[in-house]
């Protein structure tokens, strides 16, 4: 249910908080460094970790502070003015997103959800075995029919059986891709093993001997990244340690992932390019793994698959309800 509620998160937040999410288009954009300086001045006790670049001329900057789910600050891309801020957990859709991704309890919640997704796959498998007609494939068509004129108990049974078989395929995809997001390193290794693909290169580090020099502005990093690849920049990950690199994330035209999976790593002190990861040229294992997130969110097929994702996300509640009614009826009969 929570997953269905955040499929259209961006659209919902733009409707609820229009003053934070969109601005009128006017002139040239202000330098990104201007926005960063304004944020650091306004929030001196907080740590800026990443910047979401505007995807449309109207969209604002989103600056994440302290961690991925901490303080969200929004800025006008044309004036550099800060428009407002909130903690993700203090907004309804943000709270639902945290419930969906970590049960509101952090890393432990993620692991619980990952195991639950594995159990859902097992339930789908056992459900398929129970759905399979006892007389074999000759009577398989009965498993796809609902007898609407039947007594209500048989109607509930048919709704559970037919709804389950139609939802099963999509639920397995959602569950498996959910597992890949929680246990990403394990699933990535498995994908690489199955496809005989090499692993992604290790994250490069900055040379700390450059500390103390005049650090290039963020706009210089972005201009250099654009010279390397003209694809749109989606996120900038700022270094959180003296050794960390500054990462510019880009989305290639052929990518399904909404944020892209192409990365350019820079030395944070010198702007030297340390590594370029082009999603279009990645090994097959990495390319397959990169489809799991857009499959999980339904974005891979545009609006139709996003709507389908909402419907499929509601199906476990329907199956649980009909299954509970069937269990209760059997219990009454056995008394």
What are these regions (language model features)?
Residues 1-335:
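Conserved histidines in hydrophobic membrane contexts and catalytic metal-binding motifs
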């Amino acid at each position: 249910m929570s997953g269905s509620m955040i499929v259209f998160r961006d659209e919902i937040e733009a409707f609820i908080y229009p003053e934070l999410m969109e601005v009128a288009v006017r002139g040239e954009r202000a330098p990104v460094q201007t926005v960063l300086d304004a944020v650091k001045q306004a929030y001196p006790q907080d740590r800026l970790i990443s910047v979401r670049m505007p995807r449309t001329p109207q969209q604002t900057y989103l600056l994440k502070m302290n961690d991925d789910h901490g303080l969200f600050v929004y800025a006008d891309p044309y004036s550099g003015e800060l428009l407002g801020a909130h903690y993700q957990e203090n907004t309804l859709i943000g709270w639902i997103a945290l419930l969906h991704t970590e049960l509101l309890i952090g890393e432990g919640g993620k692991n619980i959800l990952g195991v639950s997704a594995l159990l859902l796959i097992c339930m789908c498998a056992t459900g398929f075995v129970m759905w399979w007609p006892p007389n074999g494939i000759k009577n398989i068509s009965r498993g796809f029919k609902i007898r609407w004129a039947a007594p209500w108990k048989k109607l509930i049974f048919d709704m559970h059986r037919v709804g389950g078989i139609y939802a099963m395929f999509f639920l397995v995809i959602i569950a498996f891709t959910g597992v890949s997001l929680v246990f990403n390193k394990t699933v990535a290794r498995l994908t690489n093993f199955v496809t005989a693909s090499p692993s992604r290169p290790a994250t490069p580090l900055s040379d700390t001997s450059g500390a103390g020099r005049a650090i290039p502005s963020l706009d210089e990093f972005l201009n250099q990244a654009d010279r390397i690849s003209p694809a749109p920049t989606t996120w900038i990950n700022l270094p959180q340690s003296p050794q960390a690199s500054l990462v510019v994330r880009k989305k290639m035209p052929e990518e399904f992932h909404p944020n892209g999976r192409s990365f350019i790593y820079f030395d944070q002190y010198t702007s030297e390019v340390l590594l370029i990861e082009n999603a279009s040229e990645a090994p097959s294992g990495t390319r397959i793994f990169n489809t799991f997130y857009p499959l999980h969110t339904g974005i891979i097929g545009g609006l139709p698959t996003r709507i389908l994702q909402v419907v499929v996300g509601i199906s476990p509640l329907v199956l649980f309800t009909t299954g509970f009614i069937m269990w209760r009826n059997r219990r009454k009969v056995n008394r």
